[in-house]
């Protein structure tokens, strides 16, 4: 991706200081999603590394990963799998606990959403500490999926999430980096 595209995408993301608490800069992609050109460009860039590759499923993490993941799945002619917070899915699920910056939570997916050996890409808006993405990777692998990659619009490299995923052997693709929290 060229620098001009990176700059355009970064400019389409709203930064909100001191949200959700003092010292944090929240990176809000709703402005990117509301801009047809930026949204299309972001999806095209998320898809690009996998063009021509057979990907069975895209796993989107709640909630913005649903928006981006659905668009990526459509472009790759893949199925879409929502990974949700505990208690939100109506059928038989598999669940995993994962670490958050300040505690532990659980996520789940339908047990029959991915078959053993299927190639899956994780999609979300942002990778920070990596807790959610690492948890989703472990959940997918628990049911036999092959996690072939993960893509995010935003990387906050100072928080180390990308490195944690790469240590699990997941190839990570991001579009924009912001320093800090």
Swiss-Prot record:
One GO biological process term: purine ribonucleoside salvage
Enzyme class name: transferase
Major subcellular location class: cytoplasm
InterPro entries membership: Ade_phspho_trans (IPR005764), PRibTrfase_dom (IPR000836), PRTase-like (IPR029057), UPRTase/APRTase (IPR050054)
Keyword Membrane: no
Keyword annotations from UniProtKB, A to Z: Cytoplasm, Glycosyltransferase, Purine salvage, Transferase
Domain of life: Bacteria
UniProt pathway: Purine metabolism; AMP biosynthesis via salvage pathway; AMP from adenine: step 1/1
Localization, UniProt: Cytoplasm
EC number annotated for this UniProt entry: 2.4.2.7
Gene Ontology MF: a single term: AMP binding
Gene Ontology, cellular component aspect: cytoplasm
Pfam short name (any one): Pribosyltran
Family that this chain belongs to: Belongs to the purine/pyrimidine phosphoribosyltransferase family.
Subunit details: Homodimer.
Described purpose of this protein according to its UniProt entry: Catalyzes a salvage reaction resulting in the formation of AMP, that is energically less costly than de novo synthesis.
Name this protein carries in UniProt: Adenine phosphoribosyltransferase
Protein species of origin: Rhizobium leguminosarum bv. trifolii (strain WSM2304)
Gene that encodes it: apt
